[in-house]
UniProtKB/Swiss-Prot annotation:
It comes from the Bacteria. Keywords: ATP-binding, Cell inner membrane, Cell membrane, Membrane, Nucleotide-binding, Repeat, Sugar transport, Translocase, Transport. This is Putative ribose/galactose/methyl galactoside import ATP-binding protein 1. It comes from Burkholderia lata (strain ATCC 17760 / DSM 23089 / LMG 22485 / NCIMB 9086 / R18194 / 383). It is found in: Cell inner membrane. Belongs to the ABC transporter superfamily. Carbohydrate importer 2 (CUT2) (TC 3.A.1.2) family. It is a peripheral membrane protein.
């Protein structure tokens, strides 16, 4: 299905047709289409991993397309790099803002392009601030160009990013989750500025998962799924349910099984009233022995933040944690490990795995003391034998336990981290995106391993952005949105549509 193009005498401001992008072993985009009109807000939607960011990075010159064509004002263009995109008037505002806190607002806007004095040596500070003030006047924004960016709120910093894009005379603005860290008043101010930009003919690509916002701001919506174009429809003519159905599709190419009933098992972990700023807001849940509790939600929902807080990696403002019925104080990962809690990070190569060390030392990383004799000597044989035992138990494919971890596949690296926590006798395990970056065969092995750990009585929280994976593995599913738990689903009742409904709303619900 091609993009919906209402008859219009002018060609689209931007038109991407048949876009394909391949990375080693992965077809990231396949025959994708997207167009943007002048003075339009066009929403781009899809699950995490649908290909939205890749498509927009091609438009912004970060990636190069392998197939397809890009036209601007009806003429074919090549966007070789971000500078070429800027020259064409295409600006992108990432969710992670790209500003320097120690520089002023004006310096951030014109960095590398500062106006110079008579001899072209020194920056003309007066002209710099005057040019920045002119952009803010256009935006109807009261902001002192001399203020250090580090002193601004996130909302104001976002306005600086918009001003920076406008300083390039941008006709196209790509906004990636622009309201993720904003409150309602700040969102209203952002929408006012978007309205002004639209009135001046700027086309805006708006990437968001927040349905209520899209109703307010978007003219059309394009949906992507699994790197493919699904449909483009006028926002006024579609429903939230229809958009969700397009996002998740109807085919679940995943093996399902009936989860065991763990409702009578002992509670291993109970969390009450956990809060940390806007990232975690009054989160509570229970986790039973032998249970896999799935944490679902969209990017920025707060799932990883909850796991890190329970593990003691980040401080909290409030909350109570009970392990096997006893209230515990967890102020650091060492405290969590002492209470039998392990955490497998979504970024295993930077947190959890020492890629420069060999397999055996990675497995023993959190338990090295048990291999030290007389407080001084390392029992190398005991270390090797223990590591070999876990290699056999978890079917870790490695030539030997002295093989450097960096030379193993992603799935085998993940098994090493699991072995580390099993050796440490952790009976409560947080798995954050456990199958990210590993192939289908390795995923199946990780699934079987998680099932086996649960059958052995381990209590598991599994955070995943892949809905089929959440449905395949979980005994219960907790859904989060904007730092809150918005609902809980029993495995037997859960569907992708129900999860997406909860992941895009802001009030708690229990669906059955």
């Amino acid at each position: 299905m091609q993009p919906d193009l209402t008859p219009n005498p002018a060609p689209p401001l931007i038109a991407l047709t048949g876009i394909g992008k391949r990375f080693p072993g992965v077809q990231a985009l396949d025959d994708c289409h997207f167009d943007l009109r002048a003075g339009e807000v066009h929403a781009l939607m899809g699950e995490n991993g649908a290909g939205k960011s890749t498509l927009m990075k091609i438009l912004a010159g970060v990636y190069q397309r392998d197939d397809g064509e890009i036209r601007m004002d009806g003429r074919a263009v090549e966007i070789a790099d971000p500078r070429a995109a800027q020259a064409l008037g295409i600006g992108i505002i990432h969710q992670e803002l790209n500003l320097m806190n120690h520089l002023s607002v004006a310096q951030n806007i014109f960095i590398g392009r500062e106006p110079r004095g008579r001899f072209g040596v020194f920056v003309d500070e007066a002209a710099l601030n005057r040019d920045a003030a002119a952009i803010f006047a256009r935006m109807r924004l009261d902001l002192d160009p001399r203020t250090p960016v580090g002193q601004l709120t996130v909302a104001k910093q976002q306005m600086v990013e918009i001003a920076k894009a406008l300083s390039f005379d941008s006709r196209v603005l790509i906004m990636d989750e622009p309201t993720a860290a904003l409150n309602n008043a700040e969102i209203a101010e952002l929408f006012r500025i978007i309205g002004d930009l639209r009135a001046h003919g700027v086309g805006i690509v708006y990437i968001s998962h927040k349905m209520d916002e899209l109703r307010q701001i978007a003219d059309r919506v394009t949906v992507m799924r699994d790197g493919k174009y699904v449909a483009t429809v006028p926002m006024a003519d579609t429903s939230m349910d229809a958009i969700i159905a397009m996002m998740v599709g109807r085919q679940l190419a995943t093996e399902f099984r009936t989860p065991p009933d763990t409702s009578a098992n002992d509670v291993a972990l109970e969390v009450r009233g956990l809060s940390r700023g806007r990232a975690i807001r009054d989160v509570g849940f229970t986790l039973r022995r032998g249970e896999i509790l799935g944490f679902a939600g969209l990017m920025g929902a707060g799932r990883t933040e909850v796991a890190r807080a329970v593990f003691g990696a980040d401080p909290v403002d409030a909350g109570e944690i009970r392990v096997h019925g006893k209230t515990v104080s967890i102020r650091s990962p060492a405290d969590a490990v002492r209470h039998g809690i392990g955490y497998l990070s979504e970024d295993r190569k930077h947190f959890g795995l020492a890629v420069g060390m060999d397999v055996q030392n990675n497995i023993a990383l959190s338990s090295m003391r048990r291999f030290v004799r007389r407080g001084l000597f390392l029992d190398a044989r005991a270390l090797r034998d223990t590591a070999q035992s876990y290699v056999r138990q978890l079917a870790i494919r490695t030539p030997s336990v002295t093989q450097p971890a960096r030379l193993l596949s992603g799935g085998n690296q993940q098994k090493i981290v699991i072995a580390k926590w099993l050796l440490r006798d952790c009976d409560i395990l947080f798995f954050d995106e456990p199958t990210r970056g590993i192939d289908v065969g390795a995923k199946s092995e990780i699934y079987k391993l998680l099932d086996a750990l649960a059958a052995d009585g381990k209590a598991i929280v599994m955070i995943s952005s892949e809905l089929p994976e959440v449905l395949r593995m979980s005994h219960r599913i907790l859904v989060m949105c904007e730092g809150r738990v918005t609902g809980e689903l029993r495995a037997a009742d859960a569907t992708q549509e129900k999860i997406m409904q909860l992941a895009t709303q802001r009030e708690s619900t229990v669906l059955s």
